[in-house]
């Protein structure tokens, strides 16, 4: 199994999945602002092919402010400033990865292109209303994504931050994959153990131990936009 079409093609034909797309389309048609924009809902899959995934970082639902969400968990397009959870991820990276310099943006595409699947468990949201699409059925779809990676790939690293992500990843086979857990990087919980978790260096140590090229976590310091 090499690509997302093979991994998820049948799933996308399921009635529940068609119903999700209909619900989202109906909201947009009714003038409701839904994030991310339609063409970016599946960006995580477009940027990180099934066979290329090395690391999975699970988010929850997309940012619900204007010009933030673009289909990658935790990532924002310039010139939007990095949101608080991402700021804390950068702080941890600076402590954990020698030489890491904090960029002036929150655009994580360079991670995605190296095999970091930045997957939200719900793929759309209404503007200004967190978790507004949580009951649309997206969780069934993203459960399938994780199940296919769990079953058909090996030696992946799953970074599960916060109780929601940890519950979502509870069935991952720990004998085939590396599962790292910590509190969420949100300012509400980062001090409970996200800071100091060293997940970024641990990820690379695991990949190297399996003969897999590590992730270069350093992002470009500035992005022209």
Curated annotation (Swiss-Prot):
Instruction: Give the GO terms filed under biological process for this record.
Output: base-excision repair, AP site formation via deaminated base removal
Q: Does the keyword Transcription regulation apply?
A: no
The EC category is hydrolase
Query: What does it catalyze?
Result: Hydrolyzes single-stranded DNA or mismatched double-stranded DNA and polynucleotides, releasing free uracil
Question: Could you name the domain of life of the organism this protein comes from?
Answer: Bacteria
Record's keyword terms, sorted: Cytoplasm, DNA damage, DNA repair, Hydrolase
- The Enzyme Commission number assigned here is 3.2.2.27
Location comes to: Cytoplasm
Indicate where this protein is primarily found.
cytoplasm
Q: Name one GO molecular function term.
A: uracil DNA N-glycosylase activity
Residue ranges of the TM segments: none
A GO cellular component entry from the record: cytoplasm
User: Which cysteines form disulfides?
Assistant: none
Tell me which family the UniProt entry assigns to this protein. Answer: Belongs to the uracil-DNA glycosylase (UDG) superfamily. UNG family.
Q: What does this protein do?
A: Excises uracil residues from the DNA which can arise as a result of misincorporation of dUMP residues by DNA polymerase or due to deamination of cytosine.
Q: What is the protein's name according to its record? A: Uracil-DNA glycosylase
Q: What organism, scientifically named, is this protein from?
A: Actinobacillus pleuropneumoniae serotype 5b (strain L20)
Lineage of source species: Bacteria, Pseudomonadati, Pseudomonadota, Gammaproteobacteria, Pasteurellales
């Amino acid at each position: 199994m090499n690509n997302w079409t093979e991994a998820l093609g049948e799933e996308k034909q399921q009635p529940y999945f068609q119903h999700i797309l209909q619900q989202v389309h109906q909201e947009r048609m009714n003038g409701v602002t839904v994030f991310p924009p339609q063409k970016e809902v599946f960006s995580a899959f477009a940027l990180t092919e099934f066979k290329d995934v090395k690391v999975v970082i699970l988010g929850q639902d997309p940012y619900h402010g204007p010009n933030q969400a673009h289909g990658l968990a935790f990532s924002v397009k310039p010139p939007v400033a990095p949101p608080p959870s991402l700021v804390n991820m950068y702080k941890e990276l600076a402590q954990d990865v020698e030489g890491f310099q904090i960029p002036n943006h929150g655009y994580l595409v360079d991670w995605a292109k190296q095999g970091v699947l930045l997957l939200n468990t719900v793929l759309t949201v209404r503007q200004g209303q967190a978790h507004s699409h949580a009951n649309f059925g997206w969780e069934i779809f993203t459960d399938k994504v994780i199940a296919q990676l769990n079953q058909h790939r090996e030696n992946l690293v799953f970074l599960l931050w916060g109780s929601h992500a940890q519950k979502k990843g509870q069935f991952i086979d720990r004998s085939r994959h590396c599962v790292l857990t910590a509190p969420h990087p949100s300012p509400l919980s980062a001090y409970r153990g996200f800071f100091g978790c060293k997940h970024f260096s641990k990820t690379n140590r695991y990949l190297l131990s399996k003969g897999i090229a590590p992730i270069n976590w350093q992002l470009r310091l500035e992005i022209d936009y």
